[in-house]
Design a protein with these regions (language model features):
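Short beta-rich binding modules
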Residues: 1-160
């Protein structure tokens, strides 16, 4: 059926184990979301692939976890109270000059390794979410992407 009128099944997902994980940033993109109040906000999403493995799927394939880190797009990256400011500062990224475009931001974060501390939080609906409590810089090469993750811009270009 092209457009179903049946409620969609909730897709089960595996929670990332809590604790420390070696990771690498594999994507950065923006999304427009509508809040509970009907307000439209732009979010900047950082996607980290970690060294932790998911349980094997039905085909026996075992992939690495990916964690999506959703951030409000601030009026100024220099706003010290903003979560994105705190995340980038903790990660050791120089943002003193700002970023003129998403592409400039991507150059600073893509393929950059990090040591993440993952914690679980429970939403209002009882769903357990993975959250990044800390994102620390890594000396040396660090964890490298496996190549299994497809960037959003590549998915969006050909969604079907």
């Amino acid at each position: 059926m092209f457009l179903s009128n049946e409620p969609a099944e909730k897709r089960e997902y595996q929670n990332h184990p809590q604790g420390v994980a070696e990771a690498v940033c594999v994507d950065a993109f923006t999304r427009e979301i509508v809040t509970k109040d009907g307000e439209t906000k732009t979010k900047l999403v950082l996607v980290f692939e970690t060294d932790k493995k998911m349980e094997a799927n039905a085909e026996g394939v075992q992939k690495n976890f990916c964690i999506w880190d959703w951030n409000n797009v601030p009026q100024s990256i220099l706003n010290e109270n903003g979560n994105l400011h705190k995340r980038l500062k903790q990660w050791g990224i120089d943002f003193s000059s700002g970023f003129n475009a998403l592409e400039d931001f991507e150059k600073a974060v893509l393929n950059r390794p990090a040591t993440l501390t993952i914690v679980h939080g429970t939403g209002e609906n009882g769903t357990v979410y993975d959250n990044i409590a800390a994102c620390l810089p890594v000396d040396g090469e660090g964890f490298q992407p496996t190549g299994a993750y497809t960037r959003q811009k590549d998915r969006d270009a050909d969604p079907y």
